[in-house]
Design a protein with these regions (language model features):
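Sec-dependent N-terminal signal peptides
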Residues: 3-13
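Stable alpha-helical elements in mature extracytoplasmic
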Residues: 39, 43, 89-92, 111-119, ...
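Surface-exposed patches in mature extracellular/periplasmic domains of secreted proteins
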Residues: 53-62, 105-108, 126-134
């Protein structure tokens, strides 16, 4: 999982002329949208330290109906429990994603059923499709020939990367049975060994890079 080329660095740098940031989605329904609070700052720190990208490495969070959310084309959603979007939030998320926005949803174990249900409300005529291991997202910056890394075992199922597309553009990436966010957390939280945490962080870089250059 090494850097694939100097060309990628140049492209990444030019795409991110301004500081890159992520907005965590504050959703309703009772689920812990705030879980893994150190994950996004750690991912953005890793991104800045290992690529030419300048970042705002803060845990920025807002609701889908907040006006400021339009300043953040890269959205992140995670949690262990239920998600319930209001009708206004459904419309807002659909509008953001259809206007060059991108959502990475990471199941932190327990999010799956409600996320799929709410995504169907946002895009009733679109389906999540599994990404093969040779998809460009697994090679966009670091190499993952075996696809999505697995951080925590949970039910012992293989990790899955599923995506929703608008024509050829990926607008939603859903990482399931992988728990990338736990891998981005401070080492003391889960006490995962560094190789597992590093794989999660590098996959996070790939996701960001792919979303910006597709």
């Amino acid at each position: 999982m090494k850097l694939i080329s100097l060309i990628s660095i140049v492209i990444f740098s030019s795409v991110n002329a301004q500081s890159f940031s992520v907005a965590r989605v504050h959703y309703g329904g009772g689920g812990d949208w705030y879980s893994d609070p150190s994950s996004i700052p750690n991912l953005l720190t890793y991104l800045e330290e290992n690529t030419p990208v300048s970042t705002i490495n803060e845990d920025i969070h807002m609701k889908l109906t907040d006006k400021e959310i339009n300043q953040y084309p890269y959205l992140y959603m995670t949690g262990h429990g239920n998600i319930r979007l209001t009708e206004d939030e459904v419309i807002s998320l659909r509008t953001i994603l259809m206007n060059n926005g991108f959502l990475h949803a990471d199941d932190n174990y327990g999010l799956d059923a409600s996320f799929r249900r709410e995504l169907k409300r946002v895009f009733p005529n679109k389906e999540l499709v599994p990404l093969p291991n040779d998809h460009p997202i697994f090679y966009s910056y670091y190499r993952f020939p075996n696809g999505l890394p697995k951080v925590h075992e949970h039910d012992g199922k293989p990790p899955q990367a599923l995506a929703l597309f608008d024509e050829d553009r990926m607008i939603v990436l859903y990482t399931y049975e992988s728990d990338l966010g736990d891998g981005w957390e401070d080492a003391s939280v889960h006490e995962d060994p560094w190789p597992i945490r590093e794989a999660a962080l590098q996959m996070g870089v790939n996701i960001i890079y792919y979303s910006l250059t597709q």
